[in-house]
Amino acid sequence: MLKREMNIADYDAELWQAMEQEKVRQEEHIELIASENYTSPRVMQAQGSQLTNKYAEGYPGKRYYGGCEYVDIVEQLAIDRAKELFGADYANVQPHSGSQANFAVYTALLQPGDTVLGMNLAQGGHLTHGSPVNFSGKLYNIIPYGIDASGKIDYDDMAKQAQEHKPKMIIGGFSAYSGVVDWARMREIADSIGAYLFVDMAHVAGLIAAGVYPNPVPHAHVVTTTTHKTLAGPRGGLILAKGGDEDLYKKLNSAVFPSAQGGPLMHVIAAKAVALKEAMEPEFKVYQQQVAKNAKAMVEVFLNRGYKVVSGGTENHLFLLDLVDKNLTGKEADAALGRANITVNKNSVPNDPKSPFVTSGIRIGSPAVTRRGFKEAEVKELAGWMCDVLDNINDEATIERVKTKVLDICARFPVYA
């Protein structure tokens, strides 16, 4: 018989120790990876619920298993909230991840070998937008578009590539682009050749939900997102659409189940429902506004300290530092900042001379530190500390001094109070 007082600590000390160490790491390190965030205890409560026990293949009202009357309510809540939050009339909340959601879109709209126009990974795109090491690059004919000399998306080149190659689908969205995307312009380009416009808004979904960044749903045929990152929910995916094309919606549903997945993760879907409700609260909008303010404040410090920021600024939650002229690699910068308890990720920059395993840049994002309560004053101080480390990358005394400051500010701004 299962007893509710059963716990990991008493049963599996080795695993529990690693879990506890990760908890300490999150509290004592400043998280600046743009794709990471802290989810609420309510979301974690849903993920740790008995819903994990329930198999529910199919969709609400159309299940293959019995006993789904309550998980139907859970999933319908998540669907309805997703549609309301993003102004969609279709939502699928079952994808296990953003990549799974993207895979479903490819499956629904394309045939293997079809031509797709996607953002170059080296210039800000994502693996699932056509990287040769990903299913998207292996199964489809990918034509990359990129950025111009100013670091902005080159829409003229995109239009030219579209006319020349006649892709069946154009992908909007990014994993390392700090500007505002002109979704309407992308739709114009797609319409000019009769292509689908598919937008992956994973990185900016929270900003979009709060009205801080333009919403692609009115412009795209299909939109996907993760439910973590700026949306601050559980790790998972979501598909949205608007326009009333019921045939498209059926294709998308079939592409998720039974094509790509079996039973949905009902405990995660419940957590998505919680996070979507949280994203409708007034304080969520205040949070997202602060995310954008904090990113801008950090950029200002880096520029004043002589660091190159790709595109010269940011209009969302992230930015890239180009370290080529500092004779530093992203790998070196990542490691040095890590020793000071500041977590970033190495990232390729435009025309990067280094390999993706080394890189010449780092990506910095503000969602997690803002979630802790940091405002402009704190992130400016933080950016200054980062410059101190990068200016003295081999000076362990500087790194230790910064680490002490990091530990102090983390204690004053805990993740979970």
Curated annotation (Swiss-Prot):
Q: Which cellular compartments is it found in?
A: Cytoplasm
Q: Name one GO cellular component term.
A: cytosol
Q: Which CDD domains match?
A: SHMT
Q: Which UniProt keywords apply?
A: Amino-acid biosynthesis, Cytoplasm, One-carbon metabolism, Pyridoxal phosphate, Transferase
Q: Which residues carry this modification: N6-(pyridoxal phosphate)lysine?
A: K229
Amino-acid biosynthesis listed as a keyword: yes
Which residues are annotated as site, described as Plays an important role in substrate specificity? H228
BP-aspect Gene Ontology terms: glycine biosynthetic process from serine; tetrahydrofolate interconversion
A Pfam family this protein belongs to? Answer: SHMT
Q: Which GO terms describe its molecular function?
A: glycine hydroxymethyltransferase activity; pyridoxal phosphate binding
Main subcellular location: cytoplasm
Q: What domain of life does the UniProt record list for this protein's source?
A: Bacteria
Catalysed transformations (reactions): (6R)-5,10-methylene-5,6,7,8-tetrahydrofolate + glycine + H2O = (6S)-5,6,7,8-tetrahydrofolate + L-serine
The residues the record assigns to binding (6S)-5,6,7,8-tetrahydrofolate are L121, G125, H126, L127, S355, P356, F357
The EC number(s) attached to this protein equal 2.1.2.1
The record's section on HAMAP family has: SHMT
**What is the role of this chain?**
Catalyzes the reversible interconversion of serine and glycine with tetrahydrofolate (THF) serving as the one-carbon carrier. This reaction serves as the major source of one-carbon groups required for the biosynthesis of purines, thymidylate, methionine, and other important biomolecules. Also exhibits THF-independent aldolase activity toward beta-hydroxyamino acids, producing glycine and aldehydes, via a retro-aldol mechanism.
NCBIfam families, per database record? PRK00011.1
Query: What family does the Swiss-Prot or TrEMBL record give for this protein?
Result: Belongs to the SHMT family.
Protein name (record) = Serine hydroxymethyltransferase
Gene from which the chain derives: glyA
